[in-house]
Amino acid sequence: PRNTTISCENSITEKIVELSHDAYKKDYHISVNRRLSMDLVKNCVMGKDTVFPEDNLKKNLIDSSMMLSFHLHPSISCKKRRNGVLLEIPGDKKMLFTHKGGNLRLEKSTYTGNFNQPQEITKMVIENSVKQSEGKINWKLEEFID
């Protein structure tokens, strides 16, 4: 990427990091932005991922789709629920991943953290129509209490 930006904000209740890059500009004529917010009161992480087309190509991108992938560590198991994905973390901890916009599916992937022994893992994939979402996907990861 030629252009990258990062900004950080901190308050007593929230920490925010916003990042953007144009790595896909040459091939797809888009820039990407991710806003991560950690709510220190509600103990959750929220994300907003956005695709920005070059102005003159906005109408061409309308029929495209965007996809986000979240690869889970091998020690984390997951179950799809009606409103998201329940993540079970070692130590009897549970987190709930939810999203707004698009369709979520679970797929197989490969973890190469231990280079000698690749492991099969699960990844969560959210795919959304740019036209329906205006190029945005919102997601949230929060503690789940039974």
Task: Give, region by region, the residue ranges found by the protein language model.
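CBM-like, beta-strand-rich accessory domains located in the C-terminal region of large
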Residues: 1-146
